[in-house]
């Protein structure tokens, strides 16, 4: 799930699951972070277009200008390749089902192209830095191994990869993340960027969480602070 606090209200965006390919993005709100009220219009978003199967999972949201951008993962109609899309709603809206406009009606905003990405780009994790959106993502399906890449966009729709190789790799034999470093989430904490991600050393039987600090060099390239 993805959460954002706006005007003292926590907006939680989560997915239905187990109805594959009919899993969609839902919305709930809370003022205390514990007790949530489901949006009566759920699901609030499902993608359209011949390029995808109609599924949407792995929600992430980021405020950008006067819009809330909702990133999600979907698959092609053959249910083989996983890729990303984006929708937008006015920040002053209630984010219910009628508020969202899909910004990529004809194609994905990021699909697997590099060898290490294999057949999957998923788990979008977006943050705003210096007026641009940086998108961290999981490349390859779970434990294949999944690793973390990064792309950047000036408008939140058209993304350019920053690296041809993973920014955060899986570990070597015997390490805690031998099978995967994946499913990132980026959080800005008073100007510091914290990237949380999962790892496994037994092909997904056991999962662990880790955190890396991300900084940006003079050219706007993100890097892991050692």
List each model region and its residues:
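Beta-rich carbohydrate-recognition and catalytic domains
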Residues: 2-54, 62-119, 127-177, 188-226
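Catalytic-core region of carbohydrate-active enzymes that cleave or remodel glycosidic bonds
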Residues: 183
